[in-house]
Amino acid sequence: MPLDAAPKRAIVPALDDLDTDESSKRVKTSGAASHFEEHLPQGIIETKEELRRHWFVGSIDQGTTSSRFLIFNGEGEPVVSHQIEFENLYPESGWHEHEPLELLSSVEECIEEAMRKFADLGYPKAHIRSIGITNQRETTVVWDSTTGEPLYNAVVWPDTRTKALVRELKARGAADTLTELCGLPLSTYPSSVKLLWLIQNVDAVKQAYDEGRLAFGTVDSWLIYKLNGGHQIDKPIHVTDSTNASRTMFMNLRTLQYDDKLLSFFGIDPNKIQLPRIVPSSDPECFGKVANGALAGIRIAGCLGDQSSALVGQGGFSPGQAKNTYGTGCFLLYNVGTEPVISKYGLLATVAYDFGGDSKPVYALEGSIAVAGSGVKFLTNNLGFVAESSQITELAGSVKDSGGVVFVTAFSGLFAPYWIDDAKGTLFGITQHTSKGHIARATLEATCFQTRAILDAMEKDSGHKLESLAVDGGLSNSDLCMQTQADISGIPVDRPAMRETTALGAAIAAGLATGVWRQLDDLKQVNRTGRMVFTPKMERPAAEKLFKKWGQAVEMSRGWVQDHLED
């Protein structure tokens, strides 16, 4: 449905009065959504086809640089949306923060504006079945449970202030045993080390911890807590889903509960801190309801970390399916099924999604790249190569290749599969011939090379070569970048026409919990039309030569961060 399409009206009996015989195509009232019959609005045709036209699901998409709210129809098509960018704070080298109340206010403003557009199309709020939340992962928020006020800025996922702390923790004998429990290697990336740094270095956080009033959460927990009314309601909603909890290093990957051994390793006393309760990603009750504003009374029924949400939005429900999201960073998830696979080749093991009920949680191998779209922003904002980030592809396309330039975009060290925390961003191969176009092209290639390295690691861990790669995210809009990805990786790259897959995933999680879709089979045709496939065009020897040169550059970027040489 186009974003400005006019709604269609229909008046018929309520669902309770409808024939539920299968041959009549009426919606059955048994199964996952049966307990939601009492919430159905009156006067809407309830065949499966008409249900999808008239039900809507909202999706909060809270990312690293912006917040958005989208409303999808029952066919998985976005109807309206609103987006707001907010300030990213860099108070010191390697530090990256958000103001927690600004995250919240940006989400609330997006909801108000999108709902205004929704009403302008003639739709009532009652047609919104529920909303889901997807969010930047690992970003750590701490607040006072008695006042609901943040105690410090949110420490964002690529922040590297914890490098010295991580080295100290790695020196402990038990550090090598953590990955088997939680799926993550010890690094600056997960929430655990961010929380520990805050307790050790921020007086207000330490005092709240000692007094038992420190609340911790990732961005999903913070938003759910606040949208439900925060500390002002009798029983504050303080929860997280298992995809977000799996990024903290506090959750056991198999039990999906907090693990005493993991908490003890980081010195976290669960009796002195309020940790969010871990719940499934799709549930009609656990996440509460929006307390105020244009969505007051609407259920929050889904929650997924952004990369898990993108996998769901791409329809990656079968083992062997994979997606790569090219956003601020770059994140490749590979569905491994209902048993976790602990990587031997530098990847993360994580929860892909957990839809609760009788279904088992599904796991994934993940490769994370710290810099993707942020590399383009660096060329735009810091170096002034172009006026707008969208112009980088044109600049990169002005030259036939990178002219021998290799850009290791290690602004926050290198993540998977390398895990080199002492690397810094480094340009190799510059000559008098080098132009802005060569550096722009090398910036796009850096993401493609790192993706290829992750794909190679996934093939080793799984024993199977990926047949194609589904892609989304802002940088996937660049045909040049996607063709380069196909050439370097040697596999087709599959891009959907509707790129809002991350937001769609959260909508799917909420919709499955509240009857918009009753099973995964109902989603087979969602986001399938208009996909574009980029097939490899470069000869394999040429691609391998470029990738080998990239590997050489990675090795040469090591060792730039040394405490005795740093100011």
Set out the residue ranges of the language-model regions.
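N-terminal phosphate-binding loop and adjacent alpha-helix
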Residues: 82-124
